[in-house]
Amino acid sequence: MKAVEFLKYVLDSVNMPEDIKKLNIGQLNRLALELRSFVLENVSKTGGHLASNLGIVELTLALHYCFDAPKDKIVWDVGHQAYIHKILTGRKDKFTTLRQLDGLSGFPKPSESEYDTFTAGHSSTSISIALGFACARDMRGSDEKVVAVIGDGSLTGGVAFEALNNAGRSNSNIIVVLNDNQMSISGNVGALSRHLGELRTERGYIEAKNDVKKLLNRFPDSEKMVNKIKRTKNRIKYLFIPGVIFEELGFKYIGPVDGNNIESLIEVINRAKNIEGPVLIHVKTKKGKGYKYAENNPSAYHGVSAFDLSTGASIKKSNKPTYSDVFGKTMCSMADEDDKIVAVSAAMGNGTGLSKFISKHPSRFYDVGIAEQHAVSFSAALAKSGFRPVFAVYSTFLQRAYDEIMQDVCLQNLHVVFAVDRAGIVGADGETHQGIYDISYFTHMPNMTVMMPKNGIELEKMLRYAVYNIDGPVAVRYPRG
């Protein structure tokens, strides 16, 4: 039998998570290759989130291999990386309808499948949701496992740290998988890191630590002795062990782990399942893995329209400039003439059309991460200091910062310009991304001016008018495309 035929057989024989559990490591690795080909073939036609899904194949396989969904709950942060999960949970044959009318959603959707534990679309909430599930389980007295899968980008959102802080104090059995596919949260220091990560989670280590405590308690002044040992241990941890921040929050930390190695992932996840209390597994994956164009430029292949699989080039229906293009060009033009112009983004610089601005005026571009609330208050202080901040943001994400818009901008009548992209109906991204709520909350805020251009020419004029002719807060809202 040829290798290609065998690969087809592996994918053809897998429809539900229980099918994965019958495979050996070699077959799982072959299945990972086949899944990447399957995703590429389909997303090149339908469009969707590509690079993140190519990077998370092995991790998704390992999660479904080790856990018993839907009894065990897997909570996906944002959810745009859940394509493999959908394929493995009975939706393979519907995958050609991804993001189409009456087709599969591009995000987890409980009404679509019981394997989708929670509706997702916005970032940084998975740990909060998982902790809620875990506490509900504890009150019921049931025994299901609860896992949150969150990316390093989502970890820049403040709500994720609020949840980590709460989860660490709860001592509830919860596993957080940190999918690190871009920024290095902590460097992999090789064999020592792996050894310490394994050592600290082994039952023998935990029992030995408890035995030492009992022994020390027999001596006079044992408390002072224990405290000295703890201080020494903590100094060593800060020098050698990655992930100390998570340990300080109350988590047992395992990692970094190769997130594209199925065998290692299965071993680590199975070990984590048997640890009492909150556990964080730090996995490092390669965004865009298996498709050279996405590997070389993962940001460009984060969200894609239909494209030519052989060249990676987008199949555009029109070469007409988009509203985002016009916005970016106008921002560059104004910044060329005015050194008070500042652009602010919440991890969406490229998506909002600011690529050229970033290249031409890097010192006046601030990407604050997935932190819309922070971005608004940050922009308010820039305005208070005499600058002209323009916060470029998708409508659906700006609603997360309602309180800051009201308190920090509008009530103080500060001149912050909100460039509200993807306003109105956005189509394929579904109900979690529609930009249909901003008008209702903008128009009841004091001092706010709302402007809506009908074309690119009006957008340029309105943006300039908003920056130079209005003293208070302004929202310029424009659609996708």
List PLM regions with ranges:
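Long, well-ordered, tryptophan-enriched scaffold segments
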Residues: 2, 11, 182-327
